[in-house]
């Protein structure tokens, strides 16, 4: 029995380190300076926002190449993830194939308003938008963001 626990712990450790560029809301993680660069700290929520600077081994996310990954932490827990996806030549807005993949992964339909697709599920927000701004490092990107409800972050 102890051997099984040791083997499972080892496999978990290897899998987390091998695919360390995937981040999920609620994960516990201590950002290390070799993998993360601090971008800022929110004065209203206390969320520490980092750019992931480690190796991106899973280069595709929802059918598009990953450009940049931004992760927000509060008290060592992931509370925000932003995957800036690189549009393919010919993409207009958020591509339908990406929308279909996201939609198949969530239980409620994505709403559309002013170029943004999104859903609020319990205490989680999901949004997709094609944009060029500071969060995308002023590059044309399809921004996929998940976040814990803002009112919870203020507590």
What are these regions (language model features)?
Residues 67-72, 130-133:
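Hydrophobic/aromatic beta-strand elements that line small-molecule binding cavities or substrate pockets
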Residues 62-65, 112:
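Short solvent-exposed loop/turn micro-motifs enriched in small/polar/acidic residues
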């Amino acid at each position: 029995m102890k051997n099984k626990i040791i083997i499972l712990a080892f496999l978990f450790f290897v899998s987390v380190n091998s695919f360390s560029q995937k981040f999920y809301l609620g994960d516990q993680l201590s950002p290390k300076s070799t993998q993360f660069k601090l971008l800022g700290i929110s004065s209203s929520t206390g969320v520490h926002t980092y750019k992931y600077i480690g190796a991106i081994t899973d280069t595709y996310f929802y059918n598009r190449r990953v450009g940049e990954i931004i992760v927000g932490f509060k008290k060592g827990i992931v509370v925000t993830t932003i995957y800036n996806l690189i549009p393919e030549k010919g993409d207009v807005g958020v591509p339908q194939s990406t929308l279909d993949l996201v939609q198949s992964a969530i239980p409620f339909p994505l709403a559309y308003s002013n170029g943004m697709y999104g859903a609020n599920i319990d205490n989680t927000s999901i949004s997709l938008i094609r944009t060029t701004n500071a969060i995308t490092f002023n590059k044309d990107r399809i921004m996929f963001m998940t976040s814990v409800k803002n009112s919870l972050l203020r507590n």
